[in-house]
Structures are given as structure tokens and as C-alpha cells.
């Protein structure tokens, strides 16, 4: 733990790392405040900041020789088998750590690896290689199962705690498992933080992008006051500002054989309105719509658009073009609407809901992994990151207002490597509510652009229904389709 004055060079380095964003740190009084250049306060500079050799320092950090927190249950024959790219990551990590040890730098590394890379199994291999007692911290209970499976495969003694940290502390008085798998809210307990700081050497922060370490959170405080000897941040979409806490990054590109297609399903709608819609439209320009809350609420009650989404999904699913579908909404009521309507069509053997308010949802997710055909309806908050259903082959994005990090994480749900190579994403840029027409079109175009430019998707026009119609279509219908295409091209 290093308390330093905020000199110009230090401030400039921190500012560059956060891409010019405001910097907040703990000061010498323990207050979490925004850092100003030339401040008279001393600030607690996170240990992980010094992991990069580009940061000059005279500080000397402890090495692993000063602790004896070694794994007792390790069996080298249980080490997981890795793909060549995963082995390359391990090689890079080991090489970097040797340099860090030689230079007496903190052993803190961010593994910036694409969705579907296999971060969990790769990290378990590293964990077994290091042979040090480990704490795995996840943002929610949904991620527990995939870690449990891999840790058990390696044969490591472990303990899972997702509820009360007090009961866990009582158990730790009599036993100290080699691996602790916990949810991040456990870090609000100072006694628990002190315990793992003393008895564990490796801290793994899964889905590190879900934490904004420029906020005064439990994870921020833990990394500042109780840092372990070693640390991995795992993410496919790193937050720039989080580098202050883990300032060494390994990023290896992943080549994929997946055939990834994104369809923009357009339609021309007559203007649609209700009393509720007119009431919400009045709030579009108010401060309460700063984060487009009412924009998304309007989408959730846009009946013609909702029907288009349902019609598209039903037709594609019935045709066998897609088989394992994830339907994502922003709002819970929107999720429930789609769930109920799909349930009426396909029944409970096919349609499932990923509801954060249902404690049994994680068990349900496990149960559908091996199904050949299913439709899983959930929210962006619950299933947009970390959802572990590798067999998903298609994604329906029913919302529009999504930031770039969320887009990349969400599309990653259907980019896991399996024997089946086709992956399909459907987005819906049209709306029948004229007041949000251009806003929705722009947001959906951003989803398309990121998927194509960064994630290797190919955009294709969704006109299968029109093209499959008989040639002897009435002239009026053909004219309507032509006008529809012209309208939507102008809209985009």
C-alpha cells in the first residue's frame, strides 16, 4: 500500500491510462475522492498500477517467497487440456511473470480475451500451475457453475459461498480450502477481506468490466486496501480506467471458423399510438430520459414492432433455421411479454425465462444446456454478460439503447466455439412510434456496425419472406415492398 502525493508525472500517467476520464482514489483520510492535479492530499495508489514496467517507481514489492499459502490438493495429471491459442496465453503469462518477479513488480495481469476463448479453463490451468491458494470472485451467481465445473475437473479442493459471508467466516476457522469461489458482495465484509489477504495468494476477478473501479465499490476498496500477492482480471471488453488496478494486459486474437450473420429485419409500420404512449412521448425530452429510459419503455409497448419480432422468431424457429435462441430485452416487463406469448405458442418444454427475481433460474439454465431446441427469454442485465449456454446459435435483440461494451458482451453469448458453426443475430431497426424512429434506427445501426467491424459478423438483408413468395404476386404487393425498402434505406 503506497500513499503518494499527486505529482504532475503521476497524475499525467493516470490520466492517460483512463483516456482522460476523471480519476477517483482513496486519500490518506480514507475518503474516496476525485483526484485534482497539484492536490495537497496523499493518495493510495493501487498495487496493480505498478505491474507495468512502463511505470517508473522505486517501490519494491513482495514476492511469493514471503508466503506459504500453497495448494495442497494439486495433482499435475488433472491439468486441463488446452487449445494452441490457450497454451500461447499461458506461455505469455508465465514469461511476463518471470520478468515481473525479476523486477520485483506486482504479479497483476489482465487477460483480455475474446468471448468464447475459454478464459475459465485457461485460468484454471494457470491456477494449477501457480499452485497458490486462490479466491475466485464473480459478479453474480450465474457464473458459479462454470467455475465449479472447471475447478472440480482440475481436482482442486474448493468451497463455494453465494449467500452469507458470516457463516463462511465461521467455517474458515476450522478449514481453509485451496480455492474459494465467492460473489463480489462478500468483499463488503472487512473481516473476510483481511482473512483472504492473509491466507490466500491469488485473486481472480471474473468479468472485470462489470465493475467500475472509479466508483467506491466493495471491489475497489478490496483492491486498494487488501490486495493479494497475485491477481488476474478476466474480460473480453476491458474498462480503460480499471487498468489503474491491474496495469499489465495480455491480449491474443482468436481466429474463428464460425459463420456469423446479422440480419436487420425491417418493416414499414403505420404510426401507432395509445394514451400510455402519448404520455411517455412527452417525457422524451425531459431530464428523466437522460439514459433513454422512456425510449426503451416506448419500445416495450410498440405492439407492431413486438409482433414483427414474434413473427420472425416463430417462422425461423419452425423452419428449423435456428434451434437454440436467446431473446434479449432491456426491461423486465418486455421480457415477460415475449415469454408469455412464446409460451402460448410453443409450451413450457421449449420456452424458458431467465428472470433475475427467480432464485431457481441458475438451475434452470443448467438444465437447458443439453436441449436440442429451446427459446430462452431474458434481460440484458441478467444474461447480457457471462451467460453460460455454449450451444446458443441465435440471438434476438429486442432493445436498442445498448453501449458498446454491452453489445460486445451480448454478441459474445452466441460466439462460443462448438461443432455447429452457424450463428445468427436479428436486430429490428424499425418502430411504429414516429417520435423515436430515428433514435432507434441510429442505435440499432451502431449494433450492426460494431458486430461487423469488430466481431466478424456479416450483415445480410432479411428479405427471405418476400423472395420466397410466388412470382404471381399482385402488383400492389410488389409496389408495397419496393416502397418499404426505399423507406427503410432512407431511415437508416
UniProtKB/Swiss-Prot annotation:
| InterPro entries per UniProt | Helicase/UvrB_N (IPR006935), Helicase_ATP-bd (IPR014001), Helicase_Restrict-Modif_Enz (IPR050742), P-loop_NTPase (IPR027417)
For the motif DESH box, give the residue ranges.
Answer: 206-209
Q: Which domain of life is it from?
A: Viruses
Q: Where in the cell is it found?
A: Virion
Helicase ATP-binding domain residues: 100-256
Q: For this UniProt entry, what is the primary localization, expressed as one broad class?
A: virion
Q: Which SMART domains match?
A: DEXDc
Record key words, sorted: ATP-binding, DNA-binding, Helicase, Hydrolase, Late protein, Nucleotide-binding, Transcription, Virion
**Pfam families xref list:** ResIII (PF04851)
**EC primary class:** hydrolase
Residues where ATP binds: 113-120
One term of GO molecular function: helicase activity
Report one GO cellular component. Answer: virion component
Instruction: Please tell me whether the keyword Secreted is annotated for this protein.
Output: no
Question: Known CDD domains for this protein?
Answer: SF2_C (cd18785)
Which E.C. number(s) belong to this protein?
3.6.4.-
Q: Tell me how this protein assembles.
A: Interacts with G2. Might be part of a transcription complex composed at least of G2, A18, and H5.
Q: What does this protein do?
A: DNA helicase which seems to act as a postreplicative transcription termination factor. Involved in ATP-dependent release of nascent RNA. Forms a stable complex with single-stranded DNA, and to a lesser extent RNA.
The entry sums up its family as follows:
Belongs to the helicase family. Poxviruses subfamily.
Q: What is this protein called?
A: Transcript termination protein A18
